[in-house]
């Protein structure tokens, strides 16, 4: 049976209702699904997706798990284990790059959110290199998105506990500047200039500087890039390690630091660094990688392609990599018979300004693909997550309503054209917009999501994990489930 898989990013279950955008939204399609379509509850966090116990899930991990049909131990766990077992100091890429210079620059997101980085990794590398007699400069990127919006001072105190004679903080940038992924080079340039060139110097201590930004109403995500302590910038032949393990928001800043042919903005000077990256950020990057990606065979898309069936993958810009690269097990190029359609995300500063985003155009692409008879259609609706990240409850309610409207069209189209339909989420977000004290929550939730299965002759969907989605799709399509995959939900 031809099948549609809808991933409603950031829409999850919570029994708390007061600040629950899903609960408060007018959602006739979901009301219909709850009454008429079997569903199970799906785990999206912690060990169920290869993350540490209790760690919130995220879009990268979720889509890898959905598409591979198995639990892959994620980079966060792999790196943490290498630190725990004292193996990272002998990592070939780390040794290769850091032995080139007595000076090592470490750059990464300063939080324990575990989505892009972990402060434990940054601290461990700094301590190892310091013990080896290296002069270590820290370039800290403040978070405020995967963790509380004003939590940087806590993480600063933690990292300052390891700062000593040869470990010091050289720069601080909010992730809005240093971790863009949409080619907003004016932002990236500001971060680059503080990190590489020591521009925008301040005489304040890092703690005083962050507090001064708070006093101006500027919180962690948006801290203006600065340099500290007389840091004059990097010099040729120094070593640089970027410690984030998630690729999408690391590419741009690393590209402008390391690419001699970089042309997106005019660099005052190009510093020739010895660069290593924690994971593979881009297949075209020439830098040594501490933790190269694990090769994942027999993913959902690969199995469908191997049976010479046509498949269609679509999402907005913000989640396009998730329904292509991540869903396909970390593979850049499309499989034979796989078509990809990118719908541009709206060009707004934050998505609460346009909570519907471009959902209607994404819905149009799905309807068209169904009418064209694709054997498998997968789509991601970004609204619940991207608007959930803004912390704006009213906007998040509108985001859910926009997704619900498109789901209604897809349900109708699936029924009309005799498609099986799965609707699930990679993780939650918008169902908890504030905590009990009314503090804004911008992070993903630690909880379950629904998986609805509208399949001819199927009246029960079991509870399970994201790893059970791909085998369920293959079963609905009457295709063999490869031995690497886990069991289906029906």
UniProtKB/Swiss-Prot annotation:
Keywords assigned by UniProt, alphabetized: Glycolysis, Isomerase, Manganese, Metal-binding
Gene Ontology biological process terms in this record: glucose catabolic process; glycolytic process
Involved pathway(s): Carbohydrate degradation; glycolysis; pyruvate from D-glyceraldehyde 3-phosphate: step 3/5
Top EC group: isomerase
MF terms (GO), sorted A to Z: manganese ion binding; phosphoglycerate mutase activity
Pfam family of the protein (one): Metalloenzyme
Signal peptide coordinates: none
Active-site feature positions: 59
Residues involved in Mn(2+) 2 binding: 9, 59, 426-427
Keyword ATP-binding recorded: no
Entries under InterPro entries matching the protein: Alkaline_phosphatase_core_sf, BPG-indep_PGM_N, Metalloenzyme, PGAM_B_sf, Pgm_bpd_ind
Record EC number: 5.4.2.12
Catalytic activity: (2R)-2-phosphoglycerate = (2R)-3-phosphoglycerate
Record: residues binding Mn(2+) 1: 385, 389, 444
CDD domains reported in the protein's UniProt record: iPGM
Cofactor: Mn(2+)
Cofactor-binding details, from the entry: Binds 2 manganese ions per subunit.
Residues noted as binding substrate in the record, renumbered to the chain: 116, 145-146, 175, 181, 246-249, 319
Role: Catalyzes the interconversion of 2-phosphoglycerate and 3-phosphoglycerate.
NCBIfam families: pgm_bpd_ind
Family membership noted in the UniProt record: Belongs to the BPG-independent phosphoglycerate mutase family.
Subunit organization: Monomer.
Protein name per Swiss-Prot or TrEMBL: 2,3-bisphosphoglycerate-independent phosphoglycerate mutase
Protein's organism: Helicobacter hepaticus (strain ATCC 51449 / 3B1)
Protein encoded by which gene: gpmI
């Amino acid at each position: 049976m031809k099948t549609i898989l809808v991933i409603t990013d950031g829409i999850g279950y919570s029994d708390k209702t007061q600040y629950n955008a899903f609960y408060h939204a007018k959602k006739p399609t979901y009301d219909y699904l709850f009454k008429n379509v079997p569903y199970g509850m799906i785990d999206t966090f912690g060990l169920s997706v290869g993350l540490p116990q209790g760690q919130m899930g995220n879009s990268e991990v979720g889509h890898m798990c959905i598409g591979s049909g198995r639990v892959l131990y994620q980079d966060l766990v792999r790196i943490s284990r290498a630190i725990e077992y004292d193996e990272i100091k002998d990592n070939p890429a780390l040794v290769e790059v850091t032995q080139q210079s007595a000076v090592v620059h470490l750059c990464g997101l300063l939080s324990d959110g575990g989505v892009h980085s972990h402060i434990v990794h940054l601290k461990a590398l700094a301590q190892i290199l310091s013990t080896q007699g290296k002069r270590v400069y820290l370039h800290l990127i403040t978070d405020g998105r995967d963790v509380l919006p004003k939590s940087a001072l806590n993480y600063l105190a933690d990292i300052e506990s390891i700062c000593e004679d040869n470990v010091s903080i050289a720069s601080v940038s909010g992730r809005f500047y240093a971790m863009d992924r949409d080619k907003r080079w004016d932002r990236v340039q500001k971060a680059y200039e503080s990190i590489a060139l020591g521009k925008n110097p301040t005489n304040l201590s890092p703690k005083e500087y962050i507090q001064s930004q708070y006093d101006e109403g500027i919180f962690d995500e948006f801290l203006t890039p600065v340099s500290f302590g007389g840091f004059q910038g990097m010099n040729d032949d120094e070593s640089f390690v970027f410690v984030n393990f998630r690729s999408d928001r690391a590419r741009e800043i690393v590209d402008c630091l390391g690419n001699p042919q970089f042309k997106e903005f005019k660099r005052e000077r190009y510093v020739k660094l010895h660069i290593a990256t924690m994971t593979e950020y881009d297949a075209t990057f020439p830098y040594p990688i501490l933790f190269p990606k694990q090769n994942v065979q027999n993913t959902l898309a690969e199995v469908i392609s191997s049976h010479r069936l046509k498949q269609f993958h679509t999402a907005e810009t913000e989640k396009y990599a998730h329904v292509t690269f991540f869903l396909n097990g970390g593979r850049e190029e499309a499989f034979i018979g796989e078509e990809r359609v990118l719908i541009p995300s709206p060009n707004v500063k934050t998505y609460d300004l346009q909570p519907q985003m471009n959902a209607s155009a994404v819905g149009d692409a799905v309807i068209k693909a169904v009418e064209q008879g694709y054997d498998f259609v997968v789509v991601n609706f970004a609204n619940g997550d991207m608007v959930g990240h803004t912390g704006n409850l009213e906007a998040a309610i509108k985001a859910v309503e926009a997704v619900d409207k498109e789901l209604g069209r897809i349900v109708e189209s699936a029924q009309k054209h005799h498609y099986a339909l799965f609707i699930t989420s990679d993780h939650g977000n918008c169902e908890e917009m504030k905590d009990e004290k009314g503090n804004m929550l911008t992070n993903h939730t630690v909880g379950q999501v629904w998986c609805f299965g509208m399949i001819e002759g199927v009246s029960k969907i079991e509870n399970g994990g994201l790893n059970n989605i791909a085998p369920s799709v293959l079963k609905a399509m009457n295709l063999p489930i490869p031995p690497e995959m886990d069991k289906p939900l029906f």
